[in-house]
Amino acid sequence: MKLVSTEILIDKGPFSSSSDWQEIKTQISQAIKAVEWPPGSGSFTIRKQSGKKRGEGSGVKPIKAAFMAKLGDFGWNLETRVDIATVKTPGPLDATKPVGDKLFAVEWETGNISSSHRSVNKMAVGLLKKKLVGGILILPTRELYQYLTDRVGNFRELAPYFPMWRALNVDEGFLAIMGVEHDLVSTKVPRISKGTNGRALA
């Protein structure tokens, strides 16, 4: 799998010039690149099949699971509960890495566009409350989105709202959106079913 775009929404303070960010960026890039299909192929080939009809298209959650497993191998904490923007038990962040007394968070979108908004908002509030030093939401590009099941949030659909997050008055922190995409498209590979073990893809 490949990273094709990074949109930086907030970059305040020294973090993006730090060795911590260089390590985080490298690990995220390596974890994306490690996601492959079919297993053992060395690249990510998506089945050329629209996800609009029931029982067609490739599942999103196994792709996310493969990426998260690789971050776990790098020592990231998975499914971290951080009290950021909730009054009840907070929903977990997909992956976090300690940076000093704060956390850097990564979310990989498997829900719809409303879920994407919630993820970015949660990380933005984390910056405002100084609980996060930074955060990244990873989304499929529109090119990959068409082959995935369900109506998963995607980069192009979220882009019109980027100015809103850029306008936030954050003293210090980093917030970005990454777009990921397949390496190849083929009718000769199987679809990724929703029940596929994510470990098989990494």
Each predicted region: which residue ranges?
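Interdomain/boundary linker segments immediately adjacent to catalytic/signaling cores
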Residues: 1-82
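Active-site metal-binding core of divalent-cation-utilizing nuclease and nuclease-like domains
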Residues: 50-58, 62-101, 112-121, 128, ...
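Residues at the C-termini of beta-strands that transition into short coil/loop
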Residues: 82, 139, 181
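A broad, low-specificity signal marking well-ordered, structured residues that form hydrophobic/aromatic
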Residues: 93, 104, 175
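Structural motif
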Residues: 102-104, 134
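Short catalytic-loop micro-motif centered on adjacent basic/acidic residues
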Residues: 105-109
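Catalytic cores of nucleic-acid endonucleases
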Residues: 110-167
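Domain-level recognition of nuclease-like catalytic cores that cleave nucleotide substrates
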Residues: 142-202
